Amino acid sequence: MSDRSLSELGEQGLLPLLQAFCPAEQRGDDAAILTPPAGQQLVVSSDVLVEGIHFSEATTPPAAIGWRAAAANLSDLAAMGATPAGITLALALPSDRRLSWLQQIYQGLDRCLKQYDCPLIGGDLSRSPTATLAVTALGWVNPNRVIRRSTAQVGDWIMATGTHGLSRLGLGHLLGEWTLAEPLRDQAIAAHQAPKPRLDVVPLLARSQPAGTVWRVAGMDSSDGLADAVLQICRASQVGAVIEALPLPATTSFDRDRLIQAALYGGEDFELVLCLSPDWAQALLELLGEQAQVIGQITEKPVVQLRLSDRTEILSLDRGFQHFTTH
């Protein structure tokens, strides 16, 4: 089929092409049917990606838009301790957008979903002057093993998986804000365009739980930055924190101050930030190895303080990205 515009194909011409990405048993009806595993509860997460706000041609090829749309929502499931059950994708697009662009969106989405064993189970199409993707992810969770933001306690260790700041470095390189050298450049661009939701950590939490203890894991993902994650957990749990280490990219070729700001406030790293009792945290570290580190501790005073060898500062939500603000 030639690379026609969406207006030339029309909705009825598009639907069979897009339904091919869904399992056969989920095609053709008005809604999807899911059967919950015994003893599991449903977890639902929604996300919207708007062209010019969340992605642009300069930084994100269509396949990467699809991958990121899936990854962001799968990361929310991981942050709740859930496993994926399915995803829906609704799109509103300009009528002159090309079919190849839309197909690449679905191909990127499909690659991500297959990697994490999650089916595409539905969606919708509409016309709009601005390209917009609305994703809903559904997952299953054992109600006795939910991760909450509100359960951190004084004395908990704060753990962060992976590296923070890479996505922001990649975005800055693509926007021309700075030039990264190899191998950091490829690592940073990959982190921005193809983030990896940490669903692998969810089963390890159960495996590392100390015998005879009650399930209590506080956490969330770091989609809006490491500082935001710690601050949101502390706000919900009515506690504070001291951060004494940061999981920065391993490089000596980039300014340290920028690395720190990227890790704290850059966002879109889609790692997990978890608060656990010290013995539980230590057991999880032994399973994750270099994929995680302890970055601080929960304190009673409701302030989040960064305390590194070369700086001390109070962290604030005002420094990170927020919709409807001008900074």
UniProtKB/Swiss-Prot annotation:
Reaction mechanism of ThiL seems to utilize a direct, inline transfer of the gamma-phosphate of ATP to TMP rather than a phosphorylated enzyme intermediate. One of its GO terms (molecular function) is thiamine-phosphate kinase activity. Pathway: Cofactor biosynthesis; thiamine diphosphate biosynthesis; thiamine diphosphate from thiamine phosphate: step 1/1. Keywords: ATP-binding, Kinase, Magnesium, Metal-binding, Nucleotide-binding, Thiamine biosynthesis, Transferase. Mg(2+) 5 binds at residue 224. Its EC number is 2.7.4.16. Substrate binds at residues 54, 268, 321. Mg(2+) 2 binds at residues 47, 76. Belongs to the thiamine-monophosphate kinase family. ATP binds at residues 106, 123-124, 149, 223. It comes from Synechococcus elongatus (strain ATCC 33912 / PCC 7942 / FACHB-805). Catalyzes the ATP-dependent phosphorylation of thiamine-monophosphate (TMP) to form thiamine-pyrophosphate (TPP), the active form of vitamin B1. It catalyses: thiamine phosphate + ATP = thiamine diphosphate + ADP. This is Thiamine-monophosphate kinase. Mg(2+) 4 binds at residues 30, 45, 76. Mg(2+) 3 binds at residues 30, 76, 221. Mg(2+) 1 binds at residues 46-47, 124. One of its GO terms (biological process) is thiamine diphosphate biosynthetic process. It holds the Pfam family AIRS. InterPro entries: PurM-like_C_dom (IPR010918), PurM-like_C_sf (IPR036676), PurM-like_N (IPR016188), PurM-like_N_sf (IPR036921), ThiL-like (IPR006283). The keyword Transmembrane helix does not apply.
